[in-house]
Amino acid sequence: MVSIFRRKVSQTSEPTFKERVQNFWQWYAERAATFHGNLKQKQHSIIQPQISAKVDELLPSAAWVFGDGPNGNGHSFTLTGEGNLHLQFLTEYWRKQAPSLEGWTFYSSRQPSNDLESWQIKIEGETFNPLEFWLAPNLDQEREKIDITAWHPLFAKLPEKNRWTVLFLVLDEALGEFGTQTWIGEINVSDRRLADALPLKELPAFVGRTEDETGWKKYAPTDTWTGYQMNEPHSRFRRGDIITGTTVNPILLREFLQSDDKLEDPLFNTGADFVFVQFPSEILPGGKQIEKRAQIENALEAALASDAAGQLIGGALGTQFAYIDLLLLDGANSLDIVQKVLRECTLPKGTSIEFYAHSKRDRRIVV
């Protein structure tokens, strides 16, 4: 049976995300052997309250699950942002900071099930067996995605919202969280089984064949860079002058633009922040703007990485300013690192560090 646990979102946030991660791993390492034994004895009820409370301290709104380790060896612990790209950057950082613990493997996203046929989920009093899901696939050549139309005999008994909940859970079981995000495109639900549908258990093999036949390459969402262009630069709000850029978090960019620079904090109560460095684009040499900006980006990325304090997530060029997008994980320390690098790069007057979240705009720093 599926066993994903969630916690209510707490309303306070004091430690930085880096501090939270350090605290979590110290706590977990001290109990890893005990947890291993509890799982071996199937004493899940003993562990669940402890883990849920600690995960709530670490990353509110995240979900977690225990599972088998690779090839059935040992146990695994998965912390997932449940498809939320903003949180997936944080869970991936958490995974990279994990200590080596005997008998344990750690994941930052839900993995494909090793035993899909025995997996079930109950919702609204109905038990859903993955073997009863049928999917009609269609290749979207332009987007390099697989569109699907899904059917299950019990869908008609569920409210529409719950149908989607069940469907995404079983897709994640079949392909893993990242597999669903990177391979599956448009999803529709049908009231009947389509003639060209295949059973859910055959979806992983279909994806594998599609990859071989098309040559489409997929990477983790947190490692997938996207280029973009703006057709109508403007001065109505920050970053409105952008002409072109790249990002590993296109959702952040889209949400910022759609909000007209009134973005609700996408990392609220996590101890982390999305920020951007803004400086006059006129200092970049003609014809080599991207190369010069990349030098500054590389310096920032190296300095933040050396202290596990953040990462580069994008950059852009505008008619007035150039931009470097960052994920900061260690509060004031991360900001100090960024300021030090910017001074070493001798950026001009008018350079600033801006917060994406509208509620934190008054925290901007003029370097």
Task: List each language-model region with its residue ranges.
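Short glycine-rich, basic-tinged beta-strand/loop micro-motifs
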Residues: Q26-H36, G72-G81, E144-A156, N269-G286, ...
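An N-terminal, globular interaction/scaffold subdomain
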Residues: Q43-W104
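Acidic, serine/threonine- and glycine-rich low-complexity intrinsically disordered segments
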Residues: I184-Q258
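Internal, hydrophobic cores of structured domains that mediate oligomerization or house catalytic pockets
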Residues: T80-K217
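Surface-exposed, low-hydrophobicity interaction/linker segments
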Residues: E14, W25-A63, I243-N249, I283-Q311
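Short amphipathic alpha-helical segments
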Residues: Q43-I47, G83-L87, R163-V166, K288-I296, ...
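C-terminal structured domains
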Residues: E102-W104, Y228-V367
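Long, low-complexity, Ser/Thr/Gly/Pro-rich intrinsically disordered segments that act as flexible linkers
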Residues: V2-Q43, L59-H75, W104-K122, E132, ...
